[in-house]
Amino acid sequence: MRQFALRSSGIIILLILWELVSRTNLIDPGLFPPPSQVISALVSLTLSGQLPKDVFASVLRAVAGFILGSMAGLFVGAVSGRIRAFDAVLTPVVQVLRPIPVIALVPLAIVWFGLGETSKIFLVFWGVFFPVWVSSYLGISRVDKNYIWAARSIGVRREKLWLQVILPAALPTIITGLRTSISLAFIVLVAAEMAGSYLGVGYRISAYHLVFQIDKMMGYIVLMGALGFIADRTFAYLVNRTLPWYQLSVNQD
Amino acid sequence: MAGHVVVENLGVSFTGKDKTIWAVKDVSLEVKSREFVSLVGVSGCGKSTVINSIAGFVPPTVGDVTVDNQPITEPNSRRGVVFQSFVLFPWKTVRENIAFGPHSRGVDEKVITQSVDQYLKLMGLMNFADHYPQQLSGGMRQRVALARVLINDPDVLLMDEPFGALDAQTRIFMQEVVLNLWESTHKSVLFVTHDIDEAVFLSDRVYVMTAAPGSIKSVYDIELERPRGAEIRLDPKFLDYKRELYEEIREESQKVLGPLPLF
Amino acid sequence: MIIRNFKLLLGILTLVLFVTGCGKVSEEESRVTLGQGMGVLNAPIFVTNEKNFWESQSLQVDVRPFVAGRLALDSLIAGDIDIATIGDTPVVYGLFKHPNLRIIATVMESNRDEKVIARRDAGIDSPGDLKGKRIGVFFGTAGEYYAIRFIEAQGLSREDVSFINIKAPDMVAALSNGSIDAYVSWEPHVQNGLRALGENAVVFLNSDIYTETWNLVTTAEFFNNNPEAVRRVLRAVVRGVEYTNANRKEAIDITEKQLGLSRDVLENIWDDYDFKVVLSENLVATLRNQGEWIQASSDLSKGKSLPDYRQVIIDQPLREILPVAVSIP
């Protein structure tokens, strides 16, 4: 409880400072609306039903893109991390595509998939795929061979190694990649929604920017931050809940 | 009488960047059924490679490795391996680590639970059954690793510097644990170490390896009476063995490190 | 004694610096950063750049292109650029938050620049068919204002269609792959859409609802600190506009190069644009109309009265340079 109070005090001080700076008219409150105004904008947008729809649309896109992207990244990373032939063929392809900043693909996604859900999910997929690929590739190709030997010498059959030894041994590295991708998913999503849409948090940020509705724009920016934070916490909670050993291993190494 | 290990003219090479490196060359040794045999040598002489070949992890480049006249093709739970770094599975609890072997061989769950409990009790780990390995001390971890292997009732126990990562007190305690276990179960044991005291204390026979690429330099039969207790370490015969082995190893160290510098 | 001499010396030095400094200002080059929104309506500025009419006014102009005047406005507000060419709608929006924006001249008027382009296979053959359709609009630009007026002229309201916010250059692709049914924009984007869709495209134009003005916009601070630079920019642009009108073929060539539209297309639409340097009553009226529209349709001006749009226009420099161009009192 004391921890919590201490942790939130920083945020509260930030809010008070922000409110004070806006109120003193040092900066035009029209350009830098105080938190009270931003919060009231958020409240009225929530009551009007617009904000929940935006959040729902954005979260759905982020989750869909994240699941597809991380599954593909995990699969390709695992296969190329463990099987020579796949490594030789796939890894150069991935390495060539990986440095392309995903934001640069936004216009291409519009040309290929239009402005609908497909292009947004595709962009999130792309953004998530590479960090998950990297972490799965590294995690799986660098699994300590002693784990495999230890398992084999107590009678674990070769075909069972994948699920019972290699994957769990690589999991801590993979989880790091997944966690990085969560914040990346939101960054990419905002960029994708800003490029063209009629629903979603990123779309509102861009639309309110263009018509100078700064309090609402800031409200949606704060909301984006909150969504990212909640997603990260939820992920951490689920990991600790389902993999109690994970935290122990991380602290150890 | 199972667990008779014979290694004949074993050579193992690895292909490096532009040349072939021999890890061991021309190693011949034997572990008879229920015998406790140690392999000592300086660091990097290829002791572990010998263990890895017998375990089935690394195929011999030349020579033969057989257990009970069967050539070794792949790892098998008849040959249990205990590693220096324990190699417990961090995603499994102590109980799950020990049960992993019988579990993957499809042993009946009830039987598994019973025998896991038995080994937990034997190793003094009953209160730590649901802990993860990361929560245990080094000595406890190595006991889990031993239990994980012994539960499969192997014929041969291959121990690769199992106490190398432990502090001196824990090490002596673990040596006694292993000796007691061996005396009650009578597995064939091949024990790799660079600690001469440990080798003499535990073994029926000690093989000394040359520096890399390792081959067998000499063999000593340790004729000390069994069962052995802590006091045997002060026995003059014990000290004689130690002295002789020490000289052998010293020669090999000098090959690797060069003569002592003169100050 | 020494002190008195020292003071004298200081006084002389200051005087010398002042005189030479002052003398230098009128001779010295002025540096101006100009942001230009890309479109056919910016043609006279393209010409001024290409012929470098800035140079003869002792101006060194750093020109930065923007996809839309609306985005140039952000840079102007942030202080990255000194002067920008922008349509009227973004300025009206911006004035609610930035009362220091100033218009120094209109360089073009047109009631045929903004258009609606739609896909026939989306079931759109007449403007009334837009009901219920997805229409791409670049929010905050004149395109948005035109789109609303167009819809209203069909007896429809904003809620009868779904507007999708898209940057103008992305509209062609979005329409081509069917993620929108229509879009509203300025040229070259409608011509580009026509080229991409061919027979499948239908274009609607309502020239009675809105006359767009394309303006040179700066901030009160920049004008107050650099009145001479502003005058020079105006003189150069006046020459650019005259040249554009006198050398139609060359002006089209220059614009073609800037926008990538073909000569034929530009020839066809060129007369839709009235290039002229003016400050007219029409500008004040269109600013006020849009101000009232924004006041009614959004809560941007909540609790505030509309700005005095006459005060937004700085007419004095243009009045000095080209008196006939100023028709506001």
Regions found by a protein language model. Give the residues of each.
Chain C
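Bacterial N-terminal signal peptides that target proteins for export
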Residues: M1-L9
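C-terminal motif of bacterial Sec signal peptides marking the signal peptidase cleavage site
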Residues: F18-G21
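Bacterial signal peptide processing site
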Residues: G23-V25
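Short, glycine-/small- and polar/acidic-enriched structural segments
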Residues: E27-S157, S162-N165, D181-E187, A201-Y210
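Pocket-lining segment of extracytoplasmic ligand-binding domains
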Residues: T89-P90, F163-I164, P169-K257
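Ligand-binding clefts/hinges and TM-proximal coupling segments of bilobed small-molecule sensing domains
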Residues: G140-E159, A236-N268, L306-R310, E320-A325
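Secondary-structure end/capping motifs
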Residues: N224-S301
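Conserved C-terminal helix/tail region of periplasmic/extracytoplasmic solute-binding proteins
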Residues: Q295-P329
